[in-house]
Regions:
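N-terminal leader segment of winged-helix/HTH proteins
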Residues: 1-35
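C-terminal regulatory/oligomerization modules of transcriptional regulators
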Residues: 1-5, 128-153
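N-terminal helix-turn-helix DNA-binding core of bacterial DNA-binding proteins
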Residues: 27-67
Length: 153
């Protein structure tokens, strides 16, 4: 049973998460505009950068929830802009891996340096134990959100 306090706490958390998401989106859109990209292209770059294993167009499609045609257009834009390169797997030439180009990674790191500094400044006010709880929460909410699908209309 949900209490008024629980609902207020959830609302406060939702507002804070939306505000953080809005600030990150503002930076993402700025970077996209500066680079002549779409915001989705920047999401693709982040997915390629954060992947635990080499990213393929198919995995990128699943991650972004786009059609294969939309992913092809996105990858084409990123390659033309010099952000990524396609590399054929040596064992199976049909498999294509997407790699972030080093110079483009430097440009992104430079652009997003204020975000990194802000995160570091925010972290400085917390103990390691507190940060561990925050990291656990963020991992849990990301996992829950990944399982959410848009309702069918």
């Amino acid at each position: 049973v949900s209490t008024a306090d629980d609902r207020a706490d959830l609302r406060t958390l939702a507002v804070l998460l939306r505000r953080m998401n809005g600030e990150i989106n503002r930076l993402v859109h700025g970077f996209a505009g500066d680079q002549g990209l779409h915001a989705t292209d920047v999401q693709a770059l982040a997915a390629i950068l954060d992947a635990d294993e080499p990213m393929t167009p198919g995995r990128l499609r699943e991650h972004l929830g786009l059609t294969s045609g939309a992913v092809t257009a996105c990858v084409d834009r990123l390659e033309r802009a010099g952000h990524i390169r396609r590399v054929r797997e040596s064992a199976d030439r049909r498999v294509v891996h997407l790699h972030y180009v080093a110079d483009a990674r430097v440009a992104a790191r430079t652009y997003f340096r204020p975000l990194a500094r802000a995160a570091q400044a925010a972290r400085a006010g917390f103990t390691d134990d507190e940060l561990a709880v925050v990291e656990r929460f963020l991992a849990a909410i990301n996992e829950e959100l990944a399982a959410v699908r848009a309702p069918e209309v």
